[in-house]
Amino acid sequence: MAKRTAVELIALQCTGCKRRNYTTSRNRRNVQEKLELRKYCPFERRRVLHREAKIK
């Protein structure tokens, strides 16, 4: 079996339309809190806060 690494894949979910527009990775050892970024949402056509969500 593969070893579990500290880097995990996450999705960034729009707080306005609740869609998952972006995927990225983060290191669990370096970043303890949930990731929040202002990114462009093509469905709302503006920059909106995106929060970290698990990839299903």
Curated annotation (Swiss-Prot):
Organism source for this protein? Treponema pallidum (strain Nichols)
Family, according to the entry, reads as follows: Belongs to the bacterial ribosomal protein bL33 family.
Q: Which SUPFAM superfamilies match?
A: Zn-binding ribosomal proteins
Q: Which InterPro entries match?
A: Ribosomal_bL33, Ribosomal_bL33_CS, Ribosomal_bL33_sf, Ribosomal_zn-bd
Write down what this protein is called.
Answer: Large ribosomal subunit protein bL33
> Would I find Transmembrane helix among this entry's keywords?
no
One annotated GO molecular function is: structural constituent of ribosome
Q: Which UniProt keywords apply?
A: Ribonucleoprotein, Ribosomal protein
Q: Which GO terms describe its cellular component?
A: cytoplasm; ribonucleoprotein complex; ribosome
Q: Which gene name belongs to this protein?
A: rpmG
Instruction: Look up the record and give one Gene Ontology term from the biological process aspect.
Output: translation
Which residue windows are coiled coil? none
